[in-house]
Amino acid sequence: MKNRFRIILAGLLAFACMTSKADEGMWLPSLISQRITDMQAKGFRLNAEDIYSINEASLKDAVVLFGRGCTGELVSPEGLLLTNHHCGYGQIQKHSSVEHDYLKDGFWAMSRAEELPNKGLTVSFLERMEDVTDAVLNGYEPSMSEEQRVEIVKNNSKAIIDEAVKEGKGLRATVEALYYGNQYFLFLYREYADVRLVGAPPSSIGKFGGDTDNWMWPRHTGDFSMFRVYADKDNNPAEYSEDNVPYRPKKYFRISTKGVQEGDFTFIYGFPGRTQEYIHSEGVRYIEETGDPHKIALRTLRLDIMNRHQSQS
């Protein structure tokens, strides 16, 4: 999947009580029923429909696409949302000034009136996902060129999207290619545009260790920020207005103070950027024998140039 494809996936890190080996894998929530028996055997206490359901409230209704590339989760019945500090960094920066340096000092709204609006920021709730492979490839023949295939996929996808967003207010849809174009899914979202900053720690906490620590484990970063989603009086999406009220989620996460124990079942629900877990063998061969060697050569050349100029300065 390309980086621009922000597709909701359940990444399973299931820990059996007798071992510490992670089962791993990335799974579409709509297909999680194929894994539920194994998950329950490892300690999961819910059903597949508790994770993903289009008819009843489920965990999917508490997990949101924050902006266009981050994951957030609802943690209160009044629209309070938790996401990463780096995901809210742009909004924190926009509200900062010389007098109020929220990046340096942090920010906490002491009342609803102090929460800060963020023009252009949206939060998207997944309504449903649907396999539309047959509809997307309708009219395609194996004898056609790649350019013809791309055109057919684009036109069919647009028609599917246009039809899907007619279903209600505030809907946004995408058609995404999975498994390198072998399968296509429609993702239908309900998008809320009134999202207000509630709180964030100082960058010395929220960005502690920077990008270096971002790729390390364990981490010691307070990488979080808090926002609140607002809606109109009928709980529907609406542009920013002082008349809007906190969104009432179908589902939200209750935060436990009990902590976790070794062997507890764990899984991650969110919007990862991309995965190459299912890349084919020739793709791996290309990375190993062609892509990476060229990258190493280019970066070595750049470092040589930098080092030469540094030694002369």
State each model region's role.
Residues 18-313:
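Terminal presequence/propeptide segments associated with secretion/organelle targeting
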Residues 1-24:
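Bacterial Sec-dependent N-terminal signal peptides
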